[in-house]
UniProtKB/Swiss-Prot annotation:
Domain of life: Eukaryota
Gene coding for it: HESX1
UniProt-annotated location(s): Nucleus
Matching PROSITE patterns: HOMEOBOX_1, HOMEOBOX_2
The name this protein goes by in its record: Homeobox expressed in ES cells 1
Coiled coil: none
DNA-binding region(s) from the entry: 108-167
Main location: nucleus
Keywords, alphabetical: Developmental protein, DNA-binding, Homeobox, Nucleus, Transcription, Transcription regulation
Length: 185
């Protein structure tokens, strides 16, 4: 082996550095494998603990930092289903059900908005006049109908898709009718 290759081989065999940071620490691989993460993303529609915390579930309350100090955001990666089975001995049945619910596919999905008949009538009337309302109209509707503006925006998107679908179906039925009458003649 040439001297330069021997030097390269010796460099690869050198002892690991004792830096204050490492790939394992950055990735969180140096933590205990069977610990449960305390931080959860803020999803008020999915919170299982009450405001008092008396229902048995632990709630983590983080105080606000002093003004002028900012912290990097914590990214919560979903735990794989197979790791959930490791924790079955440590949690009660209700806690396991809650954990499984969190691990399911709909974890971050918000609940479906149930519009009242009055809200639908108002939205339909506005849609007949303008199927692309601007932000000012949507915010005004949100205030009048006691809804969030983004829910109104989604309603209009869905309503436009429904109109497009029904228009496409009517075009198909007209073409089918014309085709059938031409065959009979």
């Amino acid at each position: 082996m040439s001297p330069s290759l021997q030097e390269g081989a010796q460099l690869g065999e050198s002892k690991p550095s004792t830096c204050s940071f490492s790939i394992e620490r950055i990735l969180g691989l140096d933590q205990k494998k069977d610990c449960v993460p305390l931080m959860k993303p803020h999803r008020p529609w999915a919170d299982t603990c009450s405001s008092s915390g008396k229902d048995g579930n632990l709630c983590l309350h983080v105080p606000n930092p002093p003004s002028g100090i900012s912290f990097p955001s914590v990214v919560d990666h979903p735990m794989p289903e197979e790791r959930a089975s490791k924790y079955e001995n440590y949690f009660s049945a209700s806690e396991r059900l809650s954990l499984k619910r969190e691990l399911s596919w709909y974890r971050g999905r918000r609940p479906r908005t149930a519009f009242t008949q009055n809200q639908i009538e108002v939205l339909e009337n506005v849609f007949r006049v303008n199927c692309y309302p601007g932000i000012d109209i949507r915010e005004d509707l949100a205030q009048k109908l006691n809804l969030e503006e983004d829910r109104i925006q989604i309603w209009f998107q869905n309503r436009r898709a429904k109109l497009k679908r029904s228009h496409r179906e009517s075009q198909f039925l007209m073409a089918k009718k014309n085709f059938n009458t031409n065959l009979l003649e």
